[in-house]
Amino acid sequence: MKSSMAATGLVAAAVVGLAVATSPTAAAADLVGPGCADYAAANPSGPASVEGMSQVPVAVAASNNPMLTTLTSAVSGRLNPQVNLVDTLNNGQYTVFAPTDPAFDKLPASTIVQLKTDSNL
């Protein structure tokens, strides 16, 4: 329960930057968020591509995306060892509104410090 609450607070704390598609039929033409077309053009193939991310579980897809390193750290236990959602995210079908690294950069440094120590967020 603490892990779920931490993820909810974490995701709500930042602006939606890039939606990670988890459908095998995902295509760059289906992207709707600001910056998504530029991301798809910059990552046309491989594990960080829209197609590549659509073929793997959510936590794996996020870890393959170079714009989601802070989110990946937050949900994998690297930011706060008491919060590890990898198994949960990888064993279900989820839509994740994934704040990008620039979104996390807009948070006060004290918030990131609190996320590192307070698993109830």
Curated annotation (Swiss-Prot):
Location(s) in or outside the cell: Secreted
Entry GO terms, CC: extracellular region
PROSITE patterns cross-referenced by the UniProt entry: FAS1 (PS50213)
Annotated signal sequence range: 1-28
Domain of life according to the entry: Bacteria
InterPro entries associated with the record: FAS1_dom_sf, FAS1_domain
Alphabetic keyword roster: Secreted, Signal
Chain segments annotated as transmembrane: none
Occurrences of domain FAS1 (ranges): 55-121
One matching Pfam family: Fasciclin
Protein name: Immunogenic protein MPT70 analog
